[in-house]
Amino acid sequence: MKLRTNAGPLQGTIQVPGDKSISHRAVILGAVAKGETRVKGLLKGEDVLSTIQAFRNLGVRIEEKDDQLVIEGQGFQGLTAPCQTLNMGNSGTSMRLIAGLLAGQPFSVKMIGDESLSKRPMDRIVYPLKQMGVEISGETDRQFPPLQLQGNRNLQPITYTLPISSAQVKSAILLAALQAKGTTQVVEKEITRNHTEEMIQQFGGRLIVDGKRITLVGPQQLTAQEITVPGDISSAAFWLVAGLIIPGSELLLKNVGVNPTRTGILEVVEKMGAQIVYEDMNKKEQVTSIRVVYSRLKGTIISGGLIPRLIDELPIIALLATQAQGTTCIKDAQELRVKETDRIQVVTDTLNSMGANIKATADGMIIKGPTVLYGANTSTYGDHRIGMMTAIAALLVKQGQVHLDKEEAIMTSYPTFFKDLERLCHD
């Protein structure tokens, strides 16, 4: 598709879709909680729809009523063996978390994904789940999907130190631990997003978080809840950056989730000189509205414990850095290489093709700015965040056209992205 270029100031108010991480977990926990769970504000992107369909195939009744998702949970014993393969589409979250959940079930299941998901490493969950007594393996020396899993009603608790910073691996172990008899401990390398821990407690589960160590004594039962999903900060990030780099822009981003394990991008842009104001902050619900205006920015260093708190925002932060004065260094982000694409290489190649000055490194990027961006032929490579980054970059282009291939990938997390973009350009 041909992207909008040479945009004037962006003006208006935006309500971004529901948080993808919280939406997944609301469905997963609701499916094994006892009673009727109702979810408001659920993201209806393709990834979350894959999770919903998986649980329907596992015998859970899920339907939409009055703009809410209603899940009829029957507890951990309420799942039934699927009559078909579980297709997780493009969703690594679906595959890894549901594998952890099914670890304690007395049946066998095969889990598959699309071409992109089939290239993403699964050994990171295979090893701990095998230690708990699950028969699980992937193809190509257990590394990649499809996954074949035979659950075990008699799971063993484990103490597991994560070799990488991964909320998905942590979550898979905790979901299995809810069904294991005894004490399971997960020790993180760096603190990652904690939605699973918070939502297990919200559903009546018990665990202890002590710094980087999470302790859970199982087995436990969960109780149905009413969940309101806040706006996704990872989706809001695209408008945050657009407002900062397009001269004359002023945007109000409504109802954005600001869980502290996800707000690294806000700290980074403020350090770079961004003018942002928080309105209607609700610290208990971890939700705020964010007013952003065009700002002159300077380069920075992004590394260490900050990386897990903004890992999904690094592509759009890279674009931001192309418009900042000076050099921005992103380090310790090697996990980007095993996302939907090798995001280090794809971000570098895409933005450099438009005139940016970015050098890819083994674990990040070195970005020099500011640079003028020009038209180019680009692709999402099947990665939703690459597609949205490119669409925001195109708004700065004053010479040439920007063509984007495989734009349908954006449906994964933000089905109304282009509709919202057009509205902000016209408000």
UniProtKB/Swiss-Prot annotation:
Monomer. Catalyzes the transfer of the enolpyruvyl moiety of phosphoenolpyruvate (PEP) to the 5-hydroxyl of shikimate-3-phosphate (S3P) to produce enolpyruvyl shikimate-3-phosphate and inorganic phosphate. This is 3-phosphoshikimate 1-carboxyvinyltransferase. One of its GO terms (cellular component) is cytoplasm. GO terms for biological process: amino acid biosynthetic process; aromatic amino acid family biosynthetic process; chorismate biosynthetic process. Keywords: Amino-acid biosynthesis, Aromatic amino acid biosynthesis, Cytoplasm, Transferase. It is an enzyme of class 2 (transferase). Its main location: cytoplasm. Belongs to the EPSP synthase family. The gene is aroA. HAMAP family: EPSP_synth. It comes from Streptococcus pyogenes serotype M49 (strain NZ131). NCBIfam families: aroA (TIGR01356).
